[in-house]
Amino acid sequence: MPSHRVRFLGVIMVGLLACAPVAVAATYYVANAGSDDNSGLSPQEAWASLTQVNAHPLAPGDAVLFKRGDAWRGQLVPQSGSEGGGYITYGAYGEGPKPLLLGSIAKDNPDDWAAAGDKLWSAGGVAPADVSGIENLLVNPGFDTDAQGWSSHAEGGAKVAVGREAGGVEGSPGAIRIACEASGSEPHHIQFYTSGFAVERGGMYRLTMAVRASAPFEMYPPVIMKSGAPWTRYAHPRNPHNMPVTAEWAVHTMTFGAVEDAGDGRLNFVLGGCLPAGVTLYLDNIRLERLGAGLIPRDVGNIILNHGPRCGVKVWNREDLDQQDEYWYDEAGFAVYVYSETNPAERYESIECAVRDHIINQQNRHHVCYENLACLYGAAHGVGGGSTHHIVVRGCDFGYIGGGDQMGGDRTVRFGNGVEFWGPAHDCLVERCRFWEVYDAAMTHQSSGGVAAQYNIVYQNNLVWNCEYSFEYWNRPETSTTHHIWFINNTCINAGHGWGHAQRPDPSGRHLCFYTSPAQQSEFYILNNVFYEAKKNAFYAPSWPLEQVKSLVMDHNCWYQAEGTMVAVSEHPFTMAEFAAYRALTGLEPHSIVAAPGLANMDALDFRLTPGSPCIDAGWAVEALYPRPADFTGVPVPQGNAPDIGAYESPASGK
C-alpha cells in the first residue's frame, strides 16, 4: 500500500490545486448582455459569445468565467495551460444556476416548422434543388483539365509526386494524384492546398471531398488557415477525426466554424506521417461552402421535448416516419423531419434538437479546468477529445448527452458520453459532477488503434442516474497500458433507465461496462461506490480473462439489482443472490455489501444516505492512500468511524 500512496498523492494534488489562481493571470467574463467589442476583463466589460471565447488568445493561469443564469449555444474549444504557468480555467461567476452550455438548436417556434405532407414537419435545411447550388469557395475543385490553383509542399525528408490524372469519381473528367515516396513524421511535412477565399467569423462551412487510395490508410482532417505566417487557424472543425481512405471512392464531409474574419483563407490537406510511403492518394470534387443560418449542419442525435424526459425517436429513413415524435435527419439537406399530428412547436413548449458536436471539444488539450458549468443537449460527448492530460472536470452537470450518428452515411452508429478521455490520457480528475440521461457512458476512458498510455485518472464523488453505462473502459491493443485508475465514492443509480435505452440496437444498461481490453493493466481501483439497479448487469466484463478480473482492486462497494444477472465476468454470470460465488471465483470485494443502499428519495433525485443505511461507515479508509477531504457537497470525510459508501457522507449521528 505505501507504494500506491506515493504515486497517487501527486494525482490528487493536481486535482486540488488545478484551479488555484495565479498572480499574473487574467480573468475574463462572459455574459449574454455583454459585447465582443468589450475587453472582457470585468463583469461590466463582459464578452458575449463563445466565438470570442474560443478565438481570444489566453495564457496559462487565465480564467474565463460565464455568468450564472445565462446560456450559450455552440461549442467551447478550450486552450491549454502549462505545467509551469498553471491551468486555464473555464468556470462561473455571479449568483444563480450554473451557466448553460447548450449543444442544441431550439425549434420551439411554430414558424420554425414547415408542413411536408403526410403529417411530416421539417425544420432547417434548404430545398433539395438548392443544395448543389450553394457557392463553392474553391477554384478548380474537380481538376477537370489541370491542377491550376492548387499547390503542394514537402519538407522534413518527405517526398511526393503530385499531378492530375484523367478520370475521377463517378466518371468525372479528372482527379488529383498524390504519390508518396517518403511520408515524413509531422502532418505539415506534406501539404496540398489552395487559397484565396474569404471566411466570416461565426459562419459555418461545409467541406466535402471524394477520396480513394491505392492502399487503405487514415487521413488527417484538412484545416482552414491563414495563407501566410503566422499560419493562424481561421476555422475549427466540428468533431475532427481521421478519415478512413480505401481503394474505393468515398465522399467525406466535415463542418467548420470560423473564428476569424479574413480574406486570405487557405484549405490545407496535411498528409505527413499519415500518407504511407508507396501509397497514392486521389482527390476529386472538393467543395467548401458557406452554410446558411437556417441549416442544421450536423446530425440531430436527440430531440428533447419540454426538457425531458420525453424525447424524439430517431429513424434512419424518411419512409420509416409513421409514429408521433419519430424524426429523421436529412444529411444532404441539413434538415430534420418529425412525424406529428400537429405542428411540433404547438404541441410542445420546448423543442431542443441536439446536434452531433462535443459541447466541449478538448482535442489535444492539457492543463485545463472546467468548473461549475452545465452541459446539456449535445448529441456527441459533453467533454470529448483525444490525446489529453492534466484535465480537471469539477462540479459540472451533464444531461441529455449523446445519440448522434458517429460516422454519417450508411454507417449508422450512435454514440455519446458525458466525459470521455480518448486515446493517450493521464493526470485527469472528474469529481463532484452530475450525469443523467446519457446515451452511452457517464464517464469513460477508452482507446483503440494506436498505442495509448492511460494512467492517473480519477473519478470520485460523482452522481450518475439513468445513463446506459455509469463507467465504461477498454484499451487496445495489447501494447497499450492502463494503470492507476480510481473510480471511488460514486453513486450510480438505474443504469439503462434513460431515454436512449429503448432506441439502441444493443440495449445494455450497465454500471461498470468493461469491453475487451488487452492493454497491460495494473493499479485499477473500484472502491466505495453505490451500484443500484441496472437493466442488465451492474458489472459487465464477460470477455475479460479471469486473471484480468482478479487484477482489479474492488472492495467496499454496495450492490443491489433485484432481478437478472447482476455480475457477468469471464463468461460467468451471477445474480445478486449468487454474489458469494462471484466473490469466491474472483477473490474480489471481501468487504462489499449486497443490500439496498437506503437513499433519501430517488424519485426526487435525493441520493443522500438515510439514517440506518448500510453504507454509513462501511467504506474503505482510502485516506490512507490519498487525501479525500470532502464529499459531493463539501462535508468533511469521515464523519464517523470510517468513510461512507457513495458520493455523500452522512453526519456522524447518521448510523
What are these regions (language model features)?
Residues 1-12:
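Bacterial N-terminal signal peptides that target proteins for export
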Residues 21-25:
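Sec/Tat signal peptide C-region and signal peptidase I cleavage site
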